[in-house]
């Protein structure tokens, strides 16, 4: 087994779910087989270990782009079964725009069940990974043929606590672990559960967060009555301080235009959509940016409110991608990208 996953809470949780529920005795992974990655970084595919015929390769919470497509084709060519689980709108747009010959190649692998995709923008990757693991969980006959995602329907209960596999037709109900619920709720910005924000803030300080093979992650998923409350309590202690810092940071923002879109911009290495307060609903989009000395690039993160624009389109125009209300990109220079409002003339 080889697992590539996004370096954020959703990706970490996806990888941990994979380790806890998708490992079998014939394909035991090591810590080195779990590879964190974020778009914009270098992924040296030539340096990967040899992939075995029939080995499963999971690509979790990583939108399809040039790098992920190269990784996918490399693994498929080596005889692996590639399972790509994602929920980013830009990834679907990328696949839709691929040349016909590339689409045909992926379709051939899909028809031979070598390339398995599970995609849904309304759910996070960790929720989709847990759903994928649940498709063959608790089946009466362990020797029965494994279910394929294309042949399985699924739903969640209205309270987002339970997965229903094949609803209405020999349906099975499987309870969703709290950590998966909270990471999902936060990542898609649904905010259904009252402890979602507290859990995700507290989770930022957890030392094993990016160690999906750890016994602590296994306990978080399987012994949640003991392991989840301390994280939630720590998060509630953080919220007040965080809000005060957000207010101070946001006061130093400025109005600008990016790709022709009016926006409110803040230069900060820290923050999420809540950084902008009510401004998120006062502008078509809000933007955070920072410079990474490590990668010598500017990181831009785009956010929009309920009535805002599709920021994934702005991100794509700058070489990035993401979701409708949350997206990002990395660029070499911002001089002609972020234009202060007083330096441009807007059409009425």
Region locations from a protein language model:
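Long, charge-rich alpha-helical interaction segments
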Residues: 212-239
């Amino acid at each position: 087994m080889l697992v590539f996953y996004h370096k954020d809470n959703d990706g970490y949780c996806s990888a941990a779910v994979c380790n806890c529920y998708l490992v079998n005795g014939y394909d035991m992974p090591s810590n080195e087989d779990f590879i964190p990655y974020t778009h914009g970084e270098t992924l040296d595919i030539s340096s990967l270990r040899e992939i075995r015929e029939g080995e499963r390769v999971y690509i979790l919470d990583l939108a399809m782009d040039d790098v992920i497509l190269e990784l996918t084709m490399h693994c498929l060519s080596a005889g692996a079964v590639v399972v790509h689980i994602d929920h980013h709108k830009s990834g679907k747009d990328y696949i839709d725009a691929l040349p016909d010959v590339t689409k045909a190649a992926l379709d051939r692998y899909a028809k031979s069940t070598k390339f398995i995709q599970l995609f849904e923008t309304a759910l996070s990757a960790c929720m989709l990974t847990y759903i994928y693991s649940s498709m063959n969980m608790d089946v009466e006959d362990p020797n029965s043929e494994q279910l394929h995602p294309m042949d399985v329907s699924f739903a969640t209960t209205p309270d987002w606590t339970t997965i229903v596999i094949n609803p209405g037709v020999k349906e099975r109900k499987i309870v969703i672990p709290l950590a998966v619920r909270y990471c999902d709720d936060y990542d898609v910005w649904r905010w259904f559960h009252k402890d979602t924000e507290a859990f995700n803030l507290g989770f930022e300080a957890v030392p094993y967060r990016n160690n999906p093979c750890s016994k602590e992650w296994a306990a978080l998923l399987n012994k949640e009555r003991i392991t989840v409350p301390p994280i939630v309590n720590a998060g509630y202690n953080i919220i007040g301080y965080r809000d005060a810092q957000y207010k101070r940071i946001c006061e130093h923002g400025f109005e600008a235009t990016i790709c022709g879109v009016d926006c409110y911009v803040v230069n900060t290495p820290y923050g999420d959509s809540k950084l902008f307060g009510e401004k998120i609903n006062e502008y078509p989009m809000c933007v955070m940016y920072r410079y990474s000395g490590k990668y010598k690039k500017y990181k831009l993160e785009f956010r929009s409110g309920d009535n805002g624009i599709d920021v994934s389109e702005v991100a794509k125009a700058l070489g990035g991608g993401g979701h409708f209300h949350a997206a990002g990109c990395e660029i070499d220079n911002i001089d002609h990208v972020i234009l202060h409002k007083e330096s441009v003339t807007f059409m009425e």
